[in-house]
Regions:
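Membrane-proximal topogenic or attachment-prone low-complexity segments at protein termini
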Residues: 2, 22-26
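Generic short alpha-helical segment signal, independent of protein family or function
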Residues: 41, 45-48, 81-84
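Post-HEXXH active-site segment of zinc metalloproteases
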Residues: 8-22, 46-78, 89-90
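Charged phosphate-binding loop/patch that engages nucleotide di/tri-phosphates or the phosphate backbone
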Residues: 1-2, 79-90
């Protein structure tokens, strides 16, 4: 996983974005370790489910249940809460 901190203008509507094994983090993220832990879950999801299949399933889930009830986001939020201390200093 490669983490790159980007300026706010490049990511004005969120704190993090994962594209396979690349994680973009907004420099203004309030809790960067949480955001990195959250996005690390998405890296794992991309890896386990597949490069083409994961984005398809993620978008399908997003349309069906919205962002807050998306199973992939729920899993990432839980992992972020439980493991954020492991990502301090990144």
């Amino acid at each position: 996983m490669k983490v790159i901190k980007v300026p706010n203008w490049l990511m004005p509507f969120g704190y993090g974005l994962t594209l396979y094994k690349l994680v973009l983090i907004n420099k203004t993220a309030e809790d960067t370790p949480y955001v990195i832990a959250h996005e690390a879950t998405h890296v794992e999801q991309w890896t386990e489910i597949g490069f083409f299949k994961f984005p398809y399933l993620y978008i399908k889930e997003l349309i069906k249940n919205g962002y807050m009830d998306n199973i992939y986001e729920s899993s990432a939020r839980e992992y972020g809460r439980l493991h954020k201390d492991e990502y301090k200093g990144m």
